[in-house]
């Protein structure tokens, strides 16, 4: 029996979550809520400048979407409490608007009949965050959870392997991050972040990110040991994390590479990093990861070691596809939780 999900918000992540769900037998999208017109919704699902045409049929019938012959209820409610998820048997609501990131606001989905809620962004309160390959085993039946951020999903698995093998004394992270929808096509008003208001296609823009600090929430042993920042760059998708750390146990760069490779292949960490962490020694660039479902692909040849305790590690991620696939992994994990 497939897990029935409803998606609130059909933007970049909402649509890529939907696309990813089409490749899973265990998850079925039964409802979508967004304020856009259903015909426009169908158009945006069919055609994607980054990921290409939708692999299947998309039609509109009686105000609903019909995708590959299956009818999906479409609504346009501003208040999640009015979504009546219960009427279509929604097990888990995927909150992808970016607007309801606290327990209080996301709980409206449960009022509407959903059993549980997954937030597709870092929570803005104490709502717990879970990252596959890092702390799924800490889930204890909570009805509202967060899948953290795309950058935390890249950084945390890598940091876990390094810390639990060699120990991280402290570290700094930089993410070179693709453009996102909040940025401006040309210079425009941005009262809180002046640099963020500059034209996205013209600039490399320094920005803040809470991704490194958030690692401490999913991996408590690293709480207070990592911080970081971002550079927004003029590419449409795929980002890369640069993690520079002081190690507690000296190690050669080859030993670090081997530890990450073993984890990626599922030979260590009880196989928890397989399907999450990747490893490559190829001469890759960002577009080589477009559409990659892994959330962190370690680039062995891009990293460097200054000493046997001070190293720079580089890991790629498709900030849309990888993250959206892990949203669905979290959906499946909390649905199948037995206590």
From Swiss-Prot:
Catalytic-site annotation from UniProt: 150 (nucleophile)
CC annotations in GO: cytoplasm
GO MF entry, a single one: NAD binding
Pfam families named among the record's database cross-references: Gp_dh_C, Gp_dh_N
Keyword Cytoplasm: yes
Main function: Catalyzes the oxidative phosphorylation of glyceraldehyde 3-phosphate (G3P) to 1,3-bisphosphoglycerate (BPG) using the cofactor NAD. The first reaction step involves the formation of a hemiacetal intermediate between G3P and a cysteine residue, and this hemiacetal intermediate is then oxidized to a thioester, with concomitant reduction of NAD to NADH. The reduced NADH is then exchanged with the second NAD, and the thioester is attacked by a nucleophilic inorganic phosphate to produce BPG.
Name this polypeptide is given: Glyceraldehyde-3-phosphate dehydrogenase
Organism annotation: Haemophilus influenzae (strain ATCC 51907 / DSM 11121 / KW20 / Rd)
